[in-house]
Every structure is written in C-alpha cells, then in structure tokens.
C-alpha cells in the first residue's frame, strides 16, 4: 500500500527515528532531531556511501573541511552573486513563496507539466497572471513581483558586528574540496582522474522549506568532486550517474521509485554544462535525491582568479598543463534517509487477518542488525551472554518485555532484520531460533555461528 507523509512522520516520531527540533519550546520551524534509531539509520547510510565511494574506490580519497570559510571563497564560487531563489509574497496574508515551485505546483494541478526553475523573473510574473495562480495559504491572487533572494546565512566572526567581520555558513561542502584541491593532490600523490569526497553539514536560508526532512535549512551532504582531463568529462559523467543509481539499488531501493531526469538548458546552474538528477517518488511527488553535475573547470578557474593560486595540473604522460574538469555527484543525506524510510515502510495483511507494520530496510542500513529475545525472563542470563558477545561487532537490541509475538512486532516496526530467540532448549543444545523479518521464517542455529551469519547477511 502507498504510504502518506503523515504516516511516515508519525511512525518516525513514535519509534524514535526523528523528533521535531526544540519540541519542549514549541519547536523551530523545519528543524528535526534524529532520535536513537534515526541516527543509526543515517550513520549506516553515510557508512555505506563512504564504503563504496571512498574505501573501495581506486580513485577517491576523503576530506573534512571547515564549515566557516574565508568570505572570498563565496565571491569566487559565485554564491554571493548568484546563489538565489525566486521569491514572491502574497500581499493579502504576507505569506512568502518560492515562485518557481508555486507555479509548478499550480500548473501540475491543472494537468500542465512545466519546468519553471531558471526562467526569467518577468516570465514567472507572466505565468502567475496567465494561469490565475492563487496563494495556497489564503486564496488571494494579489502577489508582489518575483524577486531574487540570497540563500546564504550571514553571521559575524569575533566580537564586533561589522562588514569587515562578515562570514557565512557554507551553503555546500563542495567549495572546501575545491580550495584544497592542490593540498590533496600533492600530499596523496594523486594522478588524474581522482576524486575528493566529503560528508558534512550545509546551510541554506530556504524560502519555503517543508515536506519533513526533505527540504530544511540545515542539512547534511555527501559530495564527491571527481577531477578528470578536459574532454573526458562526459564519459565520467555517465559513469557516475550509473554508479550512483547502482548504489541505491544495491541497498534495496525499488527501481520503480527512481528516475533519472536530465536538466534542460535553461535549468542548468551557472557552472554546469550537463546535469542529471536522480529523483525519488516521494508521497508528495518526484523530488531530487542526487544531483550529478558536470561543473567543467569553473570552480578551479574562479579560485585561481580570486586567490592567485595555480591549479594547473601537469599531465606527466602527455606533458600537457591544464585545469582539470570536475564531475560532482551531490547527495542529500537527510533526503536519502527519508527515501529509504519511505521505500522500506509497509503494512502487510497477514493470513490470520491481522496487519503488521514492517520496515524492509536492507540489513546493512537497519539500526539494529538483530534483537536478542529470551523466551522467558528466567532465561535472561543465557540471552544476555549472547547479547554481550554480539554487541562487540554489531548494533543489537535486547528485549525481554511482553509476549514474544509483541516483541517480534516491535522489531518489525523498526526494521530489525533478525530476531534471535533464546528458549529453554537453548540451555540444553546451545542453539537459538533466528526469525527473518521479511519472510517470518524461523531456523535453528548454533550460538557460535551467529556472528558469521549476521556478517554474511549485512554485506552489500
């Protein structure tokens, strides 16, 4: 059955995946805290990304750059001049809207598909009037003209709030990679092609955040900047598109819920000569998970111009000197975590007429890899010994409260792939019952084989 966003939000809060931020003070709009299970799920996703994009990659190395950077960075990157969203205000209720999304949603409701992102502001004004678009909040059709709104969060470094001390929270992790290109290339003795990967927080003062953790002002990115010889960028662009899609599928995401969408010319960012989004079919519609962009040599050239640093690369095979081109697969950690939660959530009708809620998370992503359940509290000592051994290697839950059936259901709801039941026979034969979350089938296994069994099941 199709899940709604309301069901996902309720389940996430009820089971400790995601809580509203600052909840005891009435919250802060569009801020979310990852609970005990949410932080495990998100961390497992980040580990899975790092494993395939860095650890197992012959090309890529990692970086963790500072959030606060010299403001000249953002002049060079174009963010101070170009990092804007089109904004429009309702004159009646004062609600503020991102103009392109307002228009796209209104047209979609009329059965018209149109990409508005990238259109001139005057054209957006025309579309609002032409299609008689109303404010979603109050129904008024009286809007201001569309204008640009810079998305960067400004703050001050030091004790005085003067323009000389202005700095910005980074709107993307990519620029920390570009300014360190030479440091990484020299110290790691990398030859092209090679990539630099980073996971970190970014901040954008979004006009209309929403849809739970899909669009927030504070978010986490998993980005790769992959540098190659000019002229080879499109073959690497295709390579990384497929690699990214395969990564999602290898972790169990349903292929029917994924599509690749190429950006039209008018949509392209100022630095890109080709961009493809990997989109996921959320309950509210298709939304971007992964942006894969060919950024050409724009960033390195700009930082050369503004810093005076030489980013030319000497190709020792051809003796050529050139500025490398760059392919950027940029994935939102919060968005992909939400997508995996939605993709895994199911309410199954069982043969006895009852319904069970289950999250079919890939075992590599599941917050707990297993739960140890003593059949009776009298068996707690033996069950605890198994738990204490397994937690040296995996995240494992221990639960001795309630009937075994209710405990199974609790673990199904949080996506635990295997329940290990320690019963009275276990005391005699040294074996336990292992229940599979998805099939609900049960097998007996020797206690000594549990570690190897779980290691095999969580591999991807």
From Swiss-Prot:
CDD domains: GlyRS-like_core (cd00774), GlyRS_anticodon (cd00858). It comes from Geobacillus kaustophilus (strain HTA426). Belongs to the class-II aminoacyl-tRNA synthetase family. The gene is glyQS. It catalyses: tRNA(Gly) + glycine + ATP = glycyl-tRNA(Gly) + AMP + diphosphate. GO terms for molecular function: ATP binding; catalytic activity, acting on a protein; glycine-tRNA ligase activity; protein dimerization activity; transferase activity. Its EC number is 6.1.1.14. This is Glycine--tRNA ligase. Its main location: cytoplasm. The lineage of its organism: Bacteria, Bacillati, Bacillota, Bacilli, Bacillales. GO terms for biological process: glycyl-tRNA aminoacylation. InterPro entries: aa-tRNA-synt_IIb, aa-tRNA-synth_II, aa-tRNA-synth_II/BPL/LPL, Anticodon-bd, Anticodon-bd_dom_sf, Gly-tRNA_synthase/POLG2, Gly_tRNA_ligase_bac, GlyRS-like_core. Pfam families: HGTP_anticodon, tRNA-synt_2b. It is found in: Cytoplasm. PROSITE patterns: AA_TRNA_LIGASE_II. Substrate binds at residues 98, 172, 219-223, 328-332. ATP binds at residues 204-206, 214-219, 288-289, 332-335. Catalyzes the attachment of glycine to tRNA(Gly). Keywords: Aminoacyl-tRNA synthetase, ATP-binding, Cytoplasm, Ligase, Nucleotide-binding, Protein biosynthesis. Homodimer. One of its GO terms (cellular component) is cytoplasm.
